[in-house]
Amino acid sequence: MEKDLVIIGGGPAGLAAAIAAREAGVEDLLILERDSRLGGILNQCIHNGFGLHTFKEELTGPEYAGRYIEKAKSLGIPYKLNTMVVDLASDGSLKKITVMNREEGLYEIEAKAVILAMGCRERSRGALNIPGYRPAGIYSAGTAQRYVNMEGRMPGREVVILGSGDIGLIMARRMTLEGAKVKLVAELMPYSGGLKRNIVQCLDDFDIPLKLSHTVVDIKGKERVEGVTIAKVDENSKPIPGTEEEITCDTLLLSCGLIPENELSDSLGVAMNPVTSGPLVNESLETNKEGVFACGNVLHVHDLVDYVSQEAEQAGKKAAVYLQGGLEPEGKAIPLKAVNGVRYTVPSSIDISRMEDLQTVRFRVGNVYRDAKVEVSCNEQTIRSQKKQILAPGEMEQVILKKSELEAIDNLEEITFSIKEL
């Protein structure tokens, strides 16, 4: 089978990218989705808060996904469900995608361009090295969310949550609304990993304690969780002896970070960012592999699905431009350097000759900063400065760069992003 464009993943990123590519003139494209339905993780996110930027109204996850699914179907975009991509390789300008499903078995698709939109997965207990037995009652927050919201099953009645990522915060509220008692949320870092609005709406409004600089050091119970031991940690994240506290519970939910799912990217030889665990991309969201683009949570973990859709639309448009022969490199790639509190930037390089008039650069900081400013500089010249009352790792930030400003700078070698405290 041959295709001009294949989108791997039928979640919010894959759908938005496919729609943008079709509207930009790509007729021969295909979405590959391993689940039994389109929509990705949004299908289990039945809470509201989606769509405020994209649709200017508040939607639930399934409602948000439904609008993109309807649009994709109205445009006649083909898709395959229950279809797993098991390998991705490059053969010159063509990309070879090895695919498997029940109806057609194992087969290969050759594509001129590929958009990576595989999303991310949760960090498991094994990756956290929590001591103790392995009893029933330990779940990732996303697994518990699927059980409650899609399958109508309650994971437990007395709950402790480790990690204050957005999924964990939302599940603290969800479990409470379903009748469970959420004893507390413990967070290893001295700050929350979630959005401020989720801390207020999901914890404060329900009087659920948030213990910062705490972690789980032991799990009690052999057949079923009977309790956990938490302890305060020092500045090196090591438990402090004598601070242990035993909490009775029958369920432990883990919300300890998300990891972009990039096994396929690795098999293709895509260059990866060690900070985000996602691909390094340029201003067109193209990886180091020609004709391979990345967007959404496979690129870097987002706070809001609206930003995923915006990013994916750009990837879809640029893939269309590539297929039409319009992405030939004309200038040199200018690296974007993250220093002084900025952990990374997306994109990681910009070819000014190929960038749009306005280029969005998204980034995260590595700590909590109050009364600070984000500075963007080129050749020791500040071209952008934004004052911020607060900057936190749990909130993605962005800066808009103007093509005209960058073109006016002589001998531009790199663009530096940094945090300056006032």
Regions found by a protein language model. Give the residues of each.
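FAD-binding core/adjacent interface of flavoenzyme oxidoreductases
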Residues: 1-8, 66-158, 234-242, 253, ...
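Exposed aromatic-hydrophobic patches
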Residues: 362, 394-406
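Mid-to-C-terminal Rossmann-like scaffold of FAD/NAD(P)H-dependent oxidoreductases
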Residues: 306, 314, 318-386
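Short, aromatic- and glycine-rich surface loops/edge beta-strands on solvent-exposed regions
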Residues: 374-376, 404-422
